[in-house]
């Protein structure tokens, strides 16, 4: 479904790709006055203008690239068209966050706001649910704002809406699955801080606005957090201050902090990576996993033939060099076998890393943040 459809060269090129692959597609259009003008929305001049999506199953899952993509609008449009064809259809949504039956200011729900800071989503008490049941539940602004449209759609189609509130229409049992609230709170707090660091870097890259940063700062303040509450960030900053050069730190699953500093041979992320593998493998810190004579030819290749100005090895080059060393060195082989243990570890760099380093660490499952 191509939502908010307008014919442009890029859209037409995308449609041609879909045609070439035999993928059916449908157009949904902008509706003037959406979402306030309910009488127009739920009419042939509103949803009626959209293409009818042909389906052959009794249960259809609507998914999309991300928030604000038009999932709910697609469902409501389809309800309108199904009814016109004499088919009685219903709608429910599965959405994990915010969690409706925990506190509005629980770190998990604040983390959801942090995750959607670019959309400016705001968690709020569901006023419809409170009025209907006298029960306080948590929802968010977009669902609360669209509920009158959903209710009017059901009222017009079936004469009655089966839902009395946005919370009613959701399927979410996540809150009942929490058995260690302190662990959940800590994980949520770390997510809030990660979102802040990532947004700061995205701002430098031109991918985030000042308003997004301001909102994340406010959320951190409301949660009683600061950047030093991220242990690896604190340690990386201390090492940079001590050495006067970029530094990195990683918190292993058992809580051990391992650091890495910039040298003539390795960038801070590469040094930290090797040091972490040593710790996990129980190898002494003074053992060299990669001989300097292995690193030197790689540096010469980078500078003399590939046009690089920085001779230091990135993480991908470091892992390739470690793999070569592992052929004849049992300790290097042992260290290489520890890579899977880095998954879900928290890492921070005191500077923004090159994209290649970010990609490697992401593939390893490391939760990276950077200062900028």
Where in the sequence are the language-model features?
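Flexible phosphate-sensing "switch/lid" loops adjacent to ATP/NTP-binding sites
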Residues: 1-63, 78-230, 234-237, 245, ...
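The conserved Walker
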Residues: 66-67
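Short clusters of small/polar residues that mark proteolytic maturation junctions
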Residues: 261-262
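A short, polar/charged loop-to-alpha-helix boundary motif
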Residues: 265-281
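Long C-terminal interaction/binding lobes of large macromolecular proteins
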Residues: 284
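Active-site pocket-lining segment
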Residues: 288-308, 317
